[in-house]
């Protein structure tokens, strides 16, 4: 049964033809093979990104994204309906948190995208709506299923888990000794600025977060990715780049620079191209590995910080 659900993506018990008919009939009265309904889909102008609006059985909906790369197909999975982290530049926090997604709802996002696109999924990033480590147990169950022999058999190394910095859960994840790529939504090199942009920093400041990241890298042997959204005139100065370089010196890590994507409600703007070049150069001069993310899907609201909670009954109208 697990193989039918997790690998074949069966939509009903009737499809599980190698199970006895009587057993399937009895089971039908006690269980339902869940599936998320595709309410809407939007394709970017470049054709490399598709955003799906998936309806849940309680009337809410989540956004899931397919990204087409030269090296494969990546699905960006949401972990919660809404988010309670309240990052100032992120649309997912608008309207607050409703509930955690069940592990099956995380998995079904991957299957729904595979069905709708007809393309095999090679990578997963837990970077959609919500904070994955605020839904720890369901997130780890999802990882176990998507990497299992009865599932899609994805390599753990092809899964990236993003967090804004829940230190106890990062430490717990490190003890799991999984080969996941940990991505930290950093966005500021000091507590004063990060307290404003990423409010969870007030509970888990950089003095706790950075050692937790170092522990994760040490226990897993995996390089930690530090995501840094560049907000024009806010966190994109050369001085802050030098602070960031000092903060990460000696850590097995990598900085991923992301020019801010439009979220009208946030009031933030993208940095100038010159500010991006200078920020990157300062990090490189400091010996910090750095890359500039090629953003996909900004024109359809599918890029970093743009996914948001919607209600199923209103989604189709939008």
From Swiss-Prot:
It comes from the Bacteria. Reaction proceeds by a ping-pong mechanism involving intermediate methylation of a conserved cysteine residue. It is found in: Cytoplasm. The gene is rlmN. The active site is at 63 (proton acceptor), 304 (s-methylcysteine intermediate). Pfam families: Radical_SAM. Residues 69-299 form the Radical SAM core domain. Its main location: cytoplasm. Binds 1 [4Fe-4S] cluster. The cluster is coordinated with 3 cysteines and an exchangeable S-adenosyl-L-methionine. It catalyses: adenosine(2503) in 23S rRNA + 2 reduced [2Fe-2S]-[ferredoxin] + 2 S-adenosyl-L-methionine = 2-methyladenosine(2503) in 23S rRNA + 5'-deoxyadenosine + L-methionine + 2 oxidized [2Fe-2S]-[ferredoxin] + S-adenosyl-L-homocysteine; adenosine(37) in tRNA + 2 reduced [2Fe-2S]-[ferredoxin] + 2 S-adenosyl-L-methionine = 2-methyladenosine(37) in tRNA + 5'-deoxyadenosine + L-methionine + 2 oxidized [2Fe-2S]-[ferredoxin] + S-adenosyl-L-homocysteine. Disulfide bonds join 76-304. Its cofactor is [4Fe-4S] cluster. HAMAP family: RNA_methyltr_RlmN. InterPro entries: Aldolase_TIM, Methyltransferase_A, RNA_MTrfase_RlmN, rRNA_lsu_MTrfase_RlmN/Cfr, rSAM. One of its GO terms (molecular function) is tRNA binding. S-adenosyl-L-methionine binds at residues 130-131, 162, 185-187, 261. Its EC number is 2.1.1.192. This is Probable dual-specificity RNA methyltransferase RlmN.
């Amino acid at each position: 049964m697990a193989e039918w659900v997790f690998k074949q993506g069966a939509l009903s018990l009737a499809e599980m033809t190698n199970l006895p008919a009587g057993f399937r009939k009895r089971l039908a009265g006690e269980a339902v093979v869940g599936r998320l309904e595709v309410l809407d889909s939007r394709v970017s102008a470049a054709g490399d990104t598709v955003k799906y609006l998936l309806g849940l059985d309680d009337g809410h909906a989540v956004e899931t994204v397919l990204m087409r790369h030269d090296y494969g197909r990546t699905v960006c999975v949401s972990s919660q309906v809404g988010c309670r982290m309240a990052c100032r530049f992120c649309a997912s926090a608008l309207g607050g948190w409703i509930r955690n997604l069940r592990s099956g709802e995380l998995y079904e996002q991957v299957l729904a995208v595979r069905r709708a696109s007809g393309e095999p999924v090679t990578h997963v990033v837990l970077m959609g709506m919500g904070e994955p480590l605020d839904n720890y147990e369901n997130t780890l169950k999802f990882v176990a299923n998507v990497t299992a022999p009865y599932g899609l058999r994805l390599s753990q190394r092809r899964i990236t888990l993003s967090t804004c910095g829940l230190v106890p859960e990062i430490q717990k994840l490190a003890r799991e000794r999984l080969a996941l790529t940990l991505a930290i939504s950093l966005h500021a090199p000091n507590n004063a600025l990060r307290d404003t942009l990423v409010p969870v920093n007030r509970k888990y400041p950089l003095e706790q977060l950075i050692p937790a990241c170092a522990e994760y890298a040490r226990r897993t042997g995996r390089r930690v990715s530090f995501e840094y959204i560049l907000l024009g005139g806010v966190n994109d100065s050369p001085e802050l780049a030098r602070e960031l370089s000092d903060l990460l010196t000696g850590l097995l890590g990598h900085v991923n620079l992301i020019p801010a994507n439009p979220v009208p409600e946030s009031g933030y703007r993208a940095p100038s191209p010159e500010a991006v070049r200078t920020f990157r150069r300062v990090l490189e001069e400091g010996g910090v590995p750095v890359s500039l993310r090629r953003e996909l899907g900004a024109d359809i609201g599918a890029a970093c910080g743009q996914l948001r909670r919607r209600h199923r009954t209103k989604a189709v109208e939008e």
